[in-house]
Amino acid sequence: MTSLTLALDAMGGDHGPHVTVPAALRALQLHSFLQIILVGDKTEIDVYLRQADPQLLSRIEVIHTDEVVSMSDRPVHALRTRKNSSMRLAIELVRDARASACVSAGNTGALMAMAKVLLKTLPGIDRPALVSCLPAVTQKPVYLLDLGANVSCDSETLFQFAVMGSVLCEAVDKKSRPKVALLNVGVEEIKGNDQVQQAAQLLQHTEQINYTGFIEGDEIYSGNVDVIVCDGFVGNITLKTSEGIAKLLVHQLKRGLTQGLFVRFLAKLIAPRIQAVLSQMNPDHYNGASLLGLRGIVVKSHGNADETAYLQAISLAVTEAQRRLPEMIKDRLESILLDINN
């Protein structure tokens, strides 16, 4: 397979190289075609490379910088002053075609600002969107966007999100004509604000998008649709609420299975099945949010991701790079706009 290079912001997130470097080494073990550029403090990075397999080390490059974007940096401040930061240098590697994708667990606002300025948006895309997947009862992922990059959106922006989400589902899951819905306060056609109503009108007249109508919050995890579109304000609250409920359920399940001798005995008997269920509910299982609509690939990992979760974000970046996701979005949007204009 053709070689593929990823740029990792090794210093981003709560744990920095303690998580990013071991995850990078595991990614290299999984993908023999993969090359990785680690951007960050070389002294800190080298601590985790000392015992690594020499064959893996031959596929790693380290670019040194001791400047880091902190979680408290405002996006504009980071954009103006953190010009030698590990985050910015990693994105620049994508811009300069030295890497096919970038992964960072750093400051989301700063990552979005830098990516938009350095990589630019695709033709026909006004704003990038942050998208990730949620679990569903059908055992297939459901893509939700936007997750907070754009607090308020007009109808045209929501329409663009629907196009990008549909293409992402096709590219990553290889699903033909994924079902797309708008998140709303009701399923009736008269429900919703002006932006959602107008976005629905646009999607209803777009044959290339398999638009199924409105969906309410209680149906998000049903698996009845593949892509759910909303503005970033609603999307971020939905995501954080989902993660909180998942943690609550895991906590309650674990506590319930430790109360009483007979219950503990049964829990041991079905431990593998319990572990499988808990894994499906764990937000880390779905780690990795894509910044869609850019001319390059950028994947955002949770800031508190552990090694396994960060590896998931790397794997997502690999898949998107292999599918050439930005080009797919660009081509599909051009085709849709051509149909609309004709």
From Swiss-Prot:
Alphabetically ordered keywords of this record: Cytoplasm, Lipid biosynthesis, Lipid metabolism, Phospholipid biosynthesis, Phospholipid metabolism, Transferase
Pfam family, one: FA_synthesis
Catalytic activity: a fatty acyl-[ACP] + phosphate = an acyl phosphate + holo-[ACP]
Pathway: Lipid metabolism; phospholipid metabolism
Top-level EC class: transferase
Superkingdom to which the source organism belongs: Bacteria
SUPFAM superfamilies linked: Isocitrate/Isopropylmalate dehydrogenase-like (SSF53659)
Compartmental location: Cytoplasm
Keyword Lipid biosynthesis among UniProt keywords: yes
One example GO MF annotation: phosphate:acyl-[acyl carrier protein] acyltransferase activity
UniProt cross-references to HAMAP family, sorted A to Z: PlsX
Function: Catalyzes the reversible formation of acyl-phosphate (acyl-PO(4)) from acyl-[acyl-carrier-protein] (acyl-ACP). This enzyme utilizes acyl-ACP as fatty acyl donor, but not acyl-CoA.
Subunit structure: Homodimer. Probably interacts with PlsY.
Protein name stated in the entry: Phosphate acyltransferase
Organism for this UniProt entry: Shewanella sp. (strain W3-18-1)
Gene designation per UniProt: plsX
